[in-house]
């Protein structure tokens, strides 16, 4: 079994997709919810996700960024497996100390790959792209564990960023 099929099976096994009435981070209503925390707190899934992304960036001179809180475990796994420096993008700057919005060393011209847990419209990850770019980083790629196929890919393309989903919601909903 290839790694993608294994990931799909594991996501289903731990109950990452739930049905009912839900309000998403984007404000949209949905009849299903991707409970990705069931994956990002599972060591087997986290390692597998880290390996899949690390394989795709191993030959690139990049830093790996995760947006607090959901994608930080993923970014950490990728960083360790790929041996790439880690950045953490805060949603709001700290109100004490350095007041940084980006943790880790980001220098002008650094190439950064962002990892995300779930995308719907891409709004959250677009804020991270903007923040990294405003601080001198170059972002043209975002990896996401699950894409809900509701506009994130298109919205990121408008900003010259490629969205690379490990799994789409269609694949997760299919009954293999």
From Swiss-Prot:
GO annotation terms (biological process)? 'de novo' UMP biosynthetic process; pyrimidine nucleobase biosynthetic process; UMP biosynthetic process
Against SUPFAM superfamilies, the record matches this protein to: PRTase-like
Task: Name the keywords, alphabetized.
Answer: Glycosyltransferase, Magnesium, Pyrimidine biosynthesis, Transferase
The UniProt annotation places orotate binding at: 120, 148
Enzyme Commission code(s) on record: 2.4.2.10
What this chain does, per the record? Catalyzes the transfer of a ribosyl phosphate group from 5-phosphoribose 1-diphosphate to orotate, leading to the formation of orotidine monophosphate (OMP).
Q: How does it assemble?
A: Homodimer.
Question: What is the name listed in the Swiss-Prot or TrEMBL entry for this protein?
Answer: Orotate phosphoribosyltransferase
